[in-house]
Every structure is written in structure tokens, then in C-alpha cells.
């Protein structure tokens, strides 16, 4: 039995959903522990494409319990839409296999309206929010003004708490942001309907996960976004509002750090970023567009084109350090097929100074230019490769170089979007 955390080792969109889908076969429980429906996991099962924003990817596997932990902020409407669609497609046959932490926070309609209005008002200083109310919901959580699932399920508590905050929210909307206010009645009517559906999924998930570990059952923690978007360790303020690093798996689920055995970081064979913020290896030329089209780099949540660039070994080393990565999974290696040469950033140039680690200062990082190591590319179609030996030598050398520069072993290589287009080098659920 092993408990494994899967996190993004870059700026999100690394292919975590596919890796989690593969690892779910070995797990008894799949746990989502942070973020909200600003995340989008795209899975390809056979010829079927499934996009999930809230519910853990493990839901596609019958007999696996899926848990949405206390660290998540949940939009009830989106959650209900997802379970409705999943059931219509033959998934989630047993409601008991999907649990919501009673302590998770609820995204309210004023969160979404504030989020959108603020972004419009930001002008050139936009963060790149998805406008789904994630940030404002976390603000209320930290400010001790949040509405938790347990509040939503208690009509009196819900009424009291919403009335306490609504006057302030309406002042922000009307006086500061020039938007429309809400009435308590419209919120109450909408959210009491949601409560009827959510009630059957609510549970003390921290206790249940504790009981599962004591019974020898395994846990797989499914992270959203990526390390460089972490609210503490990312490129602040161009970050998300939650703890995307491995430590967030414990605080966002109520599982002890002593119960974590492996942390696997997911990293594309190149790099992408959505929204604003520093991106030292960004390619704004024909090569960047080639990577965008070949990798279909458009957000599964927003549809926005992603910024593309070469692999950044400094970012990889940083992710290894702050997450304690025991392994790296490389995705989309196939996208690099056809490139005459491939590049890896091994250092930054900052005003003539060579930096070998990611700088803490955003202002410094914004002025860094990449120092590249160039490796020969390959033309072969590698999507059919079932082992490293079946890859072209140059592709193997590229993976080996990533491994050496990052400082963590490569445990999986994805050579295509399908579940079976994967080379598994080590299974983290098999403890030595």
C-alpha cells in the first residue's frame, strides 16, 4: 500500500489527468485537494474524450472512491452538471463512491461577479483569471467570511451567514466595481435547490480517508494547476489562489504528512503557460506556434491559446525542491517529433549574471533570458512506442538529459494522448 501525490511541475496543463487516470488503477481512493472548476483535466479513454473540472479523474474507474477535499472551493452548479453528464454516459453508478468534504467552501454568485468585474477593471494589469469566482471564494475563506458545505446544508446557518456578508459584497459590487447587487432571496432560492443534491455526497472526508489508510487502502492525490502557480511558491501575483504544491495535499484533505509515500511531478517535454506572468523560455515565433498546434495547446477550461516555450530545467529543479518530488512523469514527448533540434534551458541570464536557480523576485524573473543547451531532434512517430528501447536514440537522450538536469528520476513517459500510449518505468504504488 502506498499513498501518492500527483502535482504539476510547471504552470499547469501538464497532463496530470492522464497520469492520474493511469495511476488510479492501483489506488483505492482518488482525492482532489485544492482549486476549483478553474482546472480542466482532459482524458482520452478509447475514442472518448472526457473533460472534468471538479470531480477527480478516478471517477471513470468503477469501484474507486473519489473525494473532493476541504481545500477545494466548489461551485454547486458546475458539480451538479458534471455528475449529471457522467451518469448520462454510464459513470458514477454508485453515489457512495463520490464524497464531498463538509468543510469545503462554496463558491457563491457574488464571488463570480466580483471576479469578472475586477478583471475588467484591471486593464493592462490583468492576472488572467478564469472569472469563475475561485479567488474571491478563497479570500472569504481566509477572511473567515466563507460559506462551507456544512453551512449550506443547515438552512438557519446559511441564512444567517449569507445575510451577514451580503451587504458588504453588494457595496463592493456597486460602489467599487460599478456592477449590479444581489438580493438574499435570489441566492437563497438557487442554493437551497443545490443543497438537496449535495447533501447525499457530504461527509467527514478527513476521517474516512484516515480510516482507509488504517485499513491498508491506498490514496492517490490529484493536484490541479502547477507548482509555479502556487499562491506561496509561484510567480506571485500571477498565481492561482490555492496551495498547488505537495504540501497542499495534506492541508486540503486532512491527511497527515506521515501518510504520504511518493510525490510525482508531471512535466511536459516542453513548457506552456496560460495568462500573464513571467515565462523565460517563451517562444513567440514559428516554433512556438508549431508546438501550440501540434500539442493542441488550448485551455480545456477556457479555450484560450497557451503560451509555449522550451523545457526549463530551472523550473524543474525548483519543483523537485519545493515538492520533494520522488519522480517525474514526462508528457507530450511525441509533440517534439519533427523538430530538427530541441532545446533545454539550463540557466538564466540576468543583466549579464548567470542564474542557475529560479529567482524569488518577480521583477528579476521578468528580465531573465534563457541560456539553452541544444540537442538533436528526431523525426520518427513515437506514439506506438511501448518501451524506452523503442524510442529513437535522440528522444531517449533528451529524456535522460531532463532527468539529470532536474535531479529526479523519470518514472513515466507519455508518447500520445491515449491511456495506452504511455511508457511506465516505475510504479509509485509499488513500495520497495
Swiss-Prot record:
Binding-site positions, substrate: 300-306
One GO term of the biological process aspect: IMP metabolic process
Superkingdom assignment: Bacteria
UniProt binding sites for Mg(2+): 13, 40
InterPro entries associated with the record: Adenylosuccin_syn_GTP-bd, Adenylosuccin_syn_Lys_AS, Adenylosuccinate_synth_dom1, Adenylosuccinate_synth_dom2, Adenylosuccinate_synth_dom3, Adenylosuccinate_synthetase, P-loop_NTPase
Keywords linked to the UniProt accession: Cytoplasm, GTP-binding, Ligase, Magnesium, Metal-binding, Nucleotide-binding, Purine biosynthesis
Classification via PROSITE patterns: ADENYLOSUCCIN_SYN_1, ADENYLOSUCCIN_SYN_2
Stated family: Belongs to the adenylosuccinate synthetase family.
Role according to the record: Plays an important role in the de novo pathway of purine nucleotide biosynthesis. Catalyzes the first committed step in the biosynthesis of AMP from IMP.
Protein name: Adenylosuccinate synthetase
Amino acid at each position: 500500500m502506498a499513498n501518492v501525490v500527483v502535482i504539476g511541475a510547471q504552470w499547469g496543463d501538464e497532463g496530470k489527468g492522464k497520469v492520474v487516470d493511469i495511476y488510479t488503477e492501483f489506488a483505492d481512493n482518488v482525492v482532489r485537494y485544492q482549486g476549483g472548476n478553474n482546472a480542466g483535466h482532459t482524458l482520452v479513454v478509447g475514442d472518448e474524450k472526457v473533460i472534468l473540472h471538479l470531480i477527480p479523474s478516478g471517477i471513470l474507474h468503477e469501484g474507486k472512491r473519489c473525494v473532493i477535499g476541504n481545500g477545494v472551493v466548489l461551485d454547486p452548479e458546475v458539480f451538479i452538471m458534471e455528475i449529471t453528464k457522467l451518469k448520462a454516459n454510464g459513470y458514477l453508478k454508485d453515489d457512495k463512491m463520490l464524497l464531498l468534504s463538509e468543510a469545503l467552501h462554496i463558491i457563491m454568485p457574488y464571488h463570480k461577479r466580483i471576479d469578472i468585474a475586477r478583471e475588467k477593471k484591471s486593464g493592462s494589469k490583468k492576472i488572467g483569471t478564469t472569472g469563475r469566482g475561485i479567488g474571491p471564494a478563497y479570500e472569504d475563506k481566509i477572511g473567515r467570511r466563507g460559506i462551507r458545505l456544512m453551512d449550506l446544508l443547515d438552512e438557519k446557518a446559511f441564512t444567517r451567514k449569507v445575510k451577514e456578508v451580503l451587504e458588504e459584497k453588494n457595496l463592493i459590487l456597486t460602489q467599487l466595481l460599478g456592477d449590479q447587487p444581489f438580493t438574499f432571496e435570489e441566492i437563497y432560492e438557487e442554493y437551497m435547490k443545490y443543497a438537496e443534491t449535495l447533501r447525499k455526497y457530504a461527509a467527514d472526508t478527513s476521517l474516512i480517508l484516515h480510516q482507509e489508510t488504517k485499513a491498508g487502502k491506498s490514496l492517490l492525490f490529484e493536484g490541479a494547476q502547477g507548482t509555479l502557480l502556487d499562491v506561496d511558491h509561484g510567480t506571485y501575483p500571477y498565481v492561482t489562489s490555492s496551495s498547488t504544491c505537495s504540501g497542499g495535499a495534506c492541508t486540503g484533505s486532512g491527511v497527515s504528512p506521515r501518510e504520504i509515500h511518493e510525490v510525482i511531478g508531471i512535466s511536459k517535454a516542453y513548457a506552456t503557460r496560460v495568462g500573464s506572468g513571467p515565462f523565460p523560455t517563451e517562444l513567440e515565433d514559428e516554433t512556438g506556434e508549431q508546438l501550440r498546434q501540434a500539442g493542441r495547446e488550448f485551455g480545456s477550461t477556457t479555450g484560450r491559446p497557451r503560451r509555449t516555450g522550451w523545457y526549463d530545467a530551472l523550473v524543474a529543479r525548483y519543483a523537485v525542491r519545493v515538492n520533494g518530488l520522488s519522480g517525474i512523469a514526462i508528457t507530450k514527448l511525441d509533440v517534439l517529433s519533427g523538430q530538427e533540434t530541441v532545446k533545454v534551458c539550463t540557466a538564466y541570464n540576468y543583466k549579464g549574471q548567470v542564474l542557475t536557480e529560479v529567482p524569488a523576485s518577480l521583477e528579476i524573473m521578468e528580465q531573465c533570458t534563457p541560456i539553452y543547451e541544444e540537442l538533436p531532434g528526431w523525426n520518427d512517430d513515437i506514439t506506438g512506442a511501448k518501451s524506452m528501447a523503442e524510442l529513437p536514440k535522440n528522444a531517449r537522450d533528451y529524456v535522460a538529459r531532463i532527468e539529470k538536469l532536474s535531479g529526479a528520476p523519470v518514472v513515466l513517459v507519455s508518447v500520445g494522448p491515449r491511456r495506452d500510449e504511455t511508457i511506465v518505468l516505475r510504479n509509485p504504488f509499488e513500495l520497495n
